[in-house]
Regions:
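Short beta-strand elements
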Residues: 12-22, 79, 90-121
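Contiguous beta-strand segments within globular domains
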Residues: 1-12
């Protein structure tokens, strides 16, 4: 909504839609090094790299208040900013809104590719890349089913594990979505593998997820640090796990629980 208070002076409204380069990768393993400060996964969005998708100019020749609506069809997945500029006397007025576009049925998983992608937390790298390279959707869905049933031999148990896994993926999308899908975030990965924490300890810059009453056990307490950027339009939380090489065996054991089906009785 824009107001022109000048009777004999038209007001110009300039707008543009930007698309930014942003991180789309899934969370890296718990035992790997932390992200480097200059990396895109650390920053989330690179505001220095963008594409101008649309720009327009509107001139209000008459005084009064008008509402201007903008429609952008078929925006692809990614992160955008809509900017509006106008001049009021000697002052430039600038407003902006950052937003993210995901799949039409997000946070649900509907397509074989969407079902296959989160299996990256359970599969070997080469195997998952081979799965994601399958172009035929029917064959890809069969490969997803084959992965589960080849590990969990009991069909009934396999169906229960599959249901639990994708319930957590969808819940991760609901709770931890930011500039990318929630399941791809560090918190999303931890939620999928370990489930909801027993307790959450919040401070201004970090969250601690606790999965036991022993607050000193590194295998049941995980710290996420929030990385803030000097950009008032950055609308996303960006909590990243403080990784540790000691998590290697813990992560391995947790993956084996999923692959064996014992996750149903022993979460952590």
């Amino acid at each position: 909504q824009v107001t022109n208070n000048k009777i004999n002076e038209p007001q110009t409204i300039d707008t543009q839609l930007l698309k930014f380069d942003s991180d789309t990768l899934h969370a890296r393993p718990m035992s790997w090094p932390d992200y480097t400060l200059a990396s895109l996964p650390y920053k989330g969005i690179d505001y220095g790299e963008f594409e101008v998708l649309n720009n327009s100019k509107r001139i209000l020749s008459q005084p009064g208040t008008v509402t201007i609506e903008f429609f952008f069809d078929d925006l692809k997945r990614g992160n955008y900013r809509f900017e509006v500029r106008t001049q009021v006397g000697d002052e430039e007025i600038y407003k902006a809104r950052d937003f993210s576009v995901k799949s039409p049925h997000y946070p649900s998983l509907r397509t074989p590719r969407e079902l296959a992608a989160p299996l990256v937390y359970l599969m070997r790298k080469d195997d998952h890349e081979e799965l994601m390279a399958i172009s035929d959707l029917k064959h890809q869905k069969l490969a997803v089913d084959r992965f589960w049933l080849s590990n969990i031999k009991n069909t009934t148990k396999a169906l229960q594990v599959i249901e639990l896994y994708y319930e957590r993926v969808e819940e991760a999308n609901k709770q931890f979505s930011n500039y990318k899908e929630g399941w791809k975030t560090d918190m999303g990965m931890m939620y999928i593998l370990f489930g909801p924490p027993w307790y959450i300890e919040n401070t201004l810059e970090q969250k601690i997820w606790r999965y036991s009453n022993d607050f000193y056990n590194p295998e049941t307490n995980f710290t996420f640090k929030s990385y803030k950027f000097k950009n008032k339009f950055y609308p996303f939380d960006n909590f990243q796990l403080l990784r540790n090489q000691q998590y290697f065996s813990l992560e391995y054991r947790q993956i084996q629980k999923w692959l064996s089906g014992s996750i149903l009785r022993d979460n952590i």
